[in-house]
Amino acid sequence: MADPWNYAGPVTQLGPGGGAVTLVDESTFAISGGAGDITAGAAQGLFFRDTRILSQFEVLLNGNRAEPLAAVTDDPFSATFVARDAPAPGRADSTLMVFRHRHVGQGMREEVVLRNFGDEATVCSVDVLVDADFADLFAVKEGRVDSDPRHGSVTTRVEEHLSDGEGEGSLALNYTYSRGPVDRGVEIHAPGAKRVTPGLLTFEVVVPARGEWSTCVEIGPIIDGRVFAPKYRCGEPVERATPSERLAEWRRQVPLVETDHPLLKQVVARSAEDLGALRIFDPDFPERAVVAAGAPWFMTVFGRD
């Protein structure tokens, strides 16, 4: 995970309407705005196996969107979004920063961190707006979700997941989609949430002076009754997840090219990173990797490849 304070790579500076950010891991990909929000009605979302399992994911502080500052993407499947809360009345600047650490892979994990740089504790409400429409990937890409004749029914329910003895229990929001034999779903786990209702996760937060508060939201897909565990789990080190370990091993094995031509060096390095990002793996033979094409919308092996 990149540390925005010490990061030395490229950083996207954001203002209103910042550009899109795309994260990919095999058949999972997420497209959001530059501030990190997945906005309802846009050609954005979290996709798994050609289905949009998350059509909205927006973080609000006290009912308002934070001001985006930067986005850092140093891996194909992870990004950090940095923003700040609106200044308090009578103050020229804000003392509350928001860091959203996102990882995708067979679902999504998002850690939300609030850091208070002020000398007084800050009380605020964190709302996460969520929705799932299970739209077909092609309908989203072509902007015809509303006219897609293959609509099914979506039901929602809130579930309480009890503690296993090692931590606190959590609330989960479950969306289920049915259309004939097609059965899709998604579970959104929100440990520490004060309230969970369809479309909304609410956290009541006190951030101590010169301190921080954090929570982690975990999104897992369901296909034909099978629940897929996200590759990145809340509470587990991200560097131990399979995509991170595979990419680290790839980077160790890539040949080093020594040249005094800076452009050639940059092209070779970029090509190696792209090849590492485009690899897909057979679940039955995980040691076998092939390079796909068409990321993110058509991440598969084409005949011409």
Please annotate each region the language model reported:
Residues 1-88, 98, 129, 220, ...:
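Beta-strand-rich N-terminal accessory domains
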Residues 4-6, 107-109, 116-302:
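Acidic/polar, glycine-enriched structural segments that form the non-catalytic walls/loops
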Residues 37-39, 87-91, 179-185:
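Short, surface-exposed beta-strand/loop "edge" segments at domain boundaries and coil↔beta transitions
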Residues 43, 47, 98, 102, ...:
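Short, charged/polar micro-motifs that form catalytic or ligand-binding hotspots
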Residues 51-53, 71-76, 103-106, 189-194:
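A short, sequence-level motif marking secondary-structure junctions
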Residues 94-105, 126:
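Beta-sheet-dominated interaction scaffolds and their linkers
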Residues 305:
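Catalytic-loop motifs flanking and including active-site residues across diverse enzymes
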